[in-house]
């Protein structure tokens, strides 16, 4: 929307023969968010428009989900890019240390739609009642912080903490995992998510090796 408002033309495919800048956000064709792969871009450069500039945005890694193939794949996909953009310095350092060959590396932090995710109608804790704690995740991987969330859920079994705090989890949870003392809400997005987040006073995240999740930004 920003680019369109600035007068630029935007396309989500490689059908045009005069694309100035190609942005790769997800080179894996198995991903639902992938419009084209790095191989598609490579063919475009070779047969259609060699002058197009390729920017590769990296926001994923093996470390966050204990996988062993993502980093190598992204490093290979990155070889056709003119510019690499990372969502955090932590992720940039990780890929540089693992041998990514890009010489142009920048960090651009992610952001949320401030028309939706803001402090409007948010009421801070006035200490008169329980402190309402919340977190949310779309992914259900254990590394999202479920070691922390399960401990918090366990704390709520005691009268001491049950009188002081509440915990709300919005999103998906791992298979064969369940909360006993936590309010569980199905995944939400947009205004519905923002409304529910504002019903609480403290946001926490226990996500491990997170390049830059959207959850804490929202």
Question: What would you call each of these model-derived segments?
Answer:
Residues 79-105, 112-116:
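A short, active-site helix/loop in glycosyltransferases that binds the activated sugar's phosphate group
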Residues 123-144, 150-154:
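Conserved donor-binding/catalytic core segment of Leloir-type glycosyltransferases
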Residues 171-202:
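Nucleotide-activated donor-binding/catalytic signature segment of Leloir-type glycosyltransferases, i.e.
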Residues 208:
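Aromatic "clamp/platform" in nucleotide-sugar-dependent glycosyltransferases that forms part
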């Amino acid at each position: 929307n920003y680019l369109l408002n600035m007068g630029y033309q935007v396309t989500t495919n490689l059908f045009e023969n005069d694309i100035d800048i190609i942005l790769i956000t997800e080179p894996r064709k198995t991903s639902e968010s992938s419009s084209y792969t790095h191989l598609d871009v490579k063919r475009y450069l070779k047969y259609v428009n060699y002058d197009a500039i390729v920017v590769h945005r990296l926001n994923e890694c093996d470390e966050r989900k204990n996988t062993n193939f993502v980093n190598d794949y992204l490093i290979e996909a990155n070889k056709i890019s003119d510019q690499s953009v990372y969502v955090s310095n932590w992720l940039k350092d990780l890929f540089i240390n693992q041998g990514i060959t890009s010489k142009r590396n920048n960090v651009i932090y992610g952001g949320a739609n401030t028309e939706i995710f803001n402090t409007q109608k948010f009421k801070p804790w006035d200490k008169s009642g329980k402190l309402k704690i919340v977190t949310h995740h779309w992914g259900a991987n254990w590394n999202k912080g479920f070691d922390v969330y399960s401990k918090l859920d366990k704390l709520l079994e005691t009268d001491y903490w049950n009188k002081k705090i509440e915990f709300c989890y919005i999103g998906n949870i791992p298979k064969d995992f369940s909360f006993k003392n936590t309010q569980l809400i199905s995944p939400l997005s947009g205004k519905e998510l923002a409304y529910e987040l504002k019903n609480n006073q403290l946001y926490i995240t226990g996500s491990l090796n997170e390049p830059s999740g959207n959850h804490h930004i929202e």
